[in-house]
Amino acid sequence: MGKRILIVDDSESIREVVSFTLENAGHDVLKGVDGQDALKFLDGSNLDLIITDLHMPNMDGIEFIKNVRSKPDYQFVPILFLTTESQTAKKMEAKEAGATGWIIKPFVPEKLLAAIQKVVR
């Protein structure tokens, strides 16, 4: 059964590629252009997973997931970072903020889907 997944990335091409991959796997996809924009999806969307970039304008991925984790309904929803960032310090900061996993761009669609299967029940 498909899951409801929010993709947050300031790159339209990344949003479209990820969306295409997930929709072809049977998932329902919502898209936000940055953390600030994506906050609107937290009320009433019943998300199963959030996939977010780290570096975005207006509100970056770390600040975004801190906002997500502050909502009672989203304290345990998995959050994957999909980013070009590979620094260990950033990964630790993301984990401390509430990230579930980390995927480096460019990504292989099959590996993205496998990562999703690991974190979404």
Regions found by a protein language model. Name each.
Residues 16-24:
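Charged docking surfaces used in two-component/phosphorelay signaling
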Residues 56:
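Receiver (REC) domain active-site loop signature in two-component systems and cognate sites
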Residues 100:
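Short, glycine/charged-rich "phosphate-handling" switch motifs in NTP-dependent
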